[in-house]
Amino acid sequence: MNIFTLKDFSIADINQILDEAEEFKNGKKVDYHGKKVVANLFFEPSTRTHYSFDKAAYNLGCRTQNFEAGNSSVQKGETLYDTVKFFESIGCDAVVIRHPKENYFDDLIGKVSIPVVSGGDGTGNHPSQSLLDLMTIREEFGHFEGLKIVIVGDIIHSRVAHSNFEIMQRL
C-alpha cells in the first residue's frame, strides 16, 4: 500500500490507521526478525521524520537502509525512479521518501512494485505528520467532530498544513 496523500484514504481507513497506531503505542508487538528492509530515501534534510521512520522500522524488527542524496549518484544525475528501482532490486520491502519536488510520486505510480510512503513532498503534503497530529488530537479530545482547529505559521508553503487541512475538513 502506498501512502502519498491522505486524499486516497476514507475516514474509516484513517480511523483504522489511528486505532492500530494506538495499539502499538500501548505495547502491541510485531517482529519481522530483520527479514524486512525499509529504505529511507531523504533528498532533503530531516531529523524528526527521518529518525521517526527509522525508529518505527526498528520497533517492528525491520532493518533500514538510510540513503542521503548528497552522498549518492543523484549528484551525477540519477533520477528518483532509478534510485527507487535500485532499492527495489536489492530486496527492500518498502521505501520512505522525502523529496523537494511536489508530487514526486507521480513519477513512480505504476512503475515500482514496492510500497512507497511519503515523508513529505515539496510544499505539497506530509501525510505521516498529519496522521501523528490526528492521533494527538484524538488522544486529547477523544473525537474530531465539532472541533475547530487553527493552523498557524507559513501555511502557504507548509506541506504539513496542506495535509492537515485536506484531512481535517473531512473529519
Features from the language model and the residues they span:
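Short loop or secondary-structure boundary microenvironments that flank
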Residues: 7, 98, 120, 154-155
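Phosphate/diphosphate ligand-binding glycine-rich loop within oxidoreductases
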Residues: 33-138
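Alpha-helical scaffold segments in soluble metabolic enzymes
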Residues: 16-20, 86, 107, 132-139, ...
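Glycine-rich phosphate/diphosphate-binding loop of Rossmann-like nucleotide-binding domains
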Residues: 43-56, 139-171
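Positively charged, low-complexity intrinsically disordered leader regions
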Residues: 1-55
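Flexible, active-site-adjacent loop/turn segments at secondary-structure boundaries
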Residues: 1-7, 72, 142, 158
